[in-house]
Amino acid sequence: MKSSCTINTKIVDIVLIGGGLMSATLGTYLQLLEPNWTIHMYERLENTAEESSNGWNNAGTGHAAFCELNYTPIQQNGSIDISKAILINESFEISRQFWSYLVKNNLLTNPQSFINNMPHINFVWGDENTRFLYQRFKALQCCTIFNGMEYSENHQQISEWAPLIMAGRNTYQKVAATRMLMGTDVNFGELTQQLLNSLQRNPQFHLYMKTDVVDIKRNNDNTWTIYTLNSKDSYSNTEVRSRYVFIGCGGRSLQLLQQSGLNEANNYAGFPVGGKFLVTNNPTIIKDHNAKVYGKAKIGAPPISVPHLDARILNGQKMLFFGPFATFSSKFLKYGSYLDFFQSITFKNMLPMLYVGKNNFNLVKYLISQLIMSETDRLDALCEYYPKASLKDWKIIQAGQRVQVIQKDKKTGGILQFGTKVIYSQDRTLSTLLGASPGASTAAYIMLELLDVMFKQYITSESWQRKLKEIIPSYGQILNGNLSLTNQIRSYTCEVLNLNYIKAMPS
């Protein structure tokens, strides 16, 4: 095997590691704000958006907190905490504004190729769960951004909303559902490809495929040297220096953070969890289900286990997914290495991992129960949401890998975090995105927050402020509680993205 080394002496403005939605979103922001900046993006696979950004690999495809019950947990005092749901919905509204600006300026095309109306429905059964859902519904009534949510315990009404989940169900079963017609389905793979196509129109943007980042080192002048290995070009090595670095390569981000030598890396470990889905494209079944139906995780199960019967539109074709069923692999990426997990273990993060294992026995038990599931077990789980389901209509697929963040904690030794977290170097020139859900849906918000931290000296400038307010009309404002602004923003994004607009009314 031949190998050569090329050293790029010119300092680039920013290196983006990973060819997924997060890097594409950050690159798009920066190209709009500083079109003359040099941006290098490195993707280790042959194609971009092949990991978690891919529509087949997402755990969920339209997180807006309308129907994800794990974002509204019950507090010890019995009340419902809606703070996370509010944040996620506000974040998704920023994503919609970001995409709308790009469509208006012909940087994204044919919005129906990546976003479509899809009602978001919650469905539960049993006295305790129906009480919880009603309590959640009432708690969200005070929120402008959840205006329009409907609640029903009527079998006939719920059957009209989602026929599949009610056909064949015991008519005496206690059930409840909520519905948000404002819900959407998003194809993040298509969205990522379009963002990258747009970025490549600028000669200052350089995309390197089949190029693996193997090391990151800080230089004395506070720049960074990125070492890459290109498997397409006789395994040639390249070194490039950059003022800024963003590590957004999914599960592999933790390993590169560790290689960067940052002290911040010592506070984190990762636990890989995969997922499988039952999928059907049977037109007879699909025509009767036009919604994303989310249930409630069973007692003792972790938040990542929320089951859903999820209509998705992939490459113009409607599909129906049910799951997820948890899987375990030591890979940090779907197309990663079985050594990923073991290579990420250090003397400094080993103890937090052990503490998390000890303190999260329910998670361990849940994973074991998922791993030993038979086809019949999976069908039984599906029949709870689709009573007339037959296994012959469904196939099982392996979805993507996610790496849950484990963080050192003085009190408990280690905490398993469900969500995304951005880690920064002390001088804010390098950042890393760790974690998973809600991820893609809130990408525009997460990257906007990242701009505020990494580019503090730029974001306060008049030119950046003016441009950001042009891209995100609600920039610097909160929608929730502001009925006029909520309607103004939603009316605008619905018109541009060809979505149905439902006006929020006074409570």
Curated annotation (Swiss-Prot):
The keyword Methyltransferase does not apply. It is an enzyme of class 1 (oxidoreductase). The keyword Transferase does not apply. GO terms for biological process: tricarboxylic acid cycle. Keywords: FAD, Flavoprotein, Oxidoreductase, Tricarboxylic acid cycle. Its cofactor is FAD. Its EC number is 1.1.5.4. It catalyses: (S)-malate + a quinone = a quinol + oxaloacetate. Pathway: Carbohydrate metabolism; tricarboxylic acid cycle; oxaloacetate from (S)-malate (quinone route): step 1/1. PANTHER family: L-2-HYDROXYGLUTARATE DEHYDROGENASE, MITOCHONDRIAL. Belongs to the MQO family. This is Probable malate:quinone oxidoreductase. The gene is mqo.
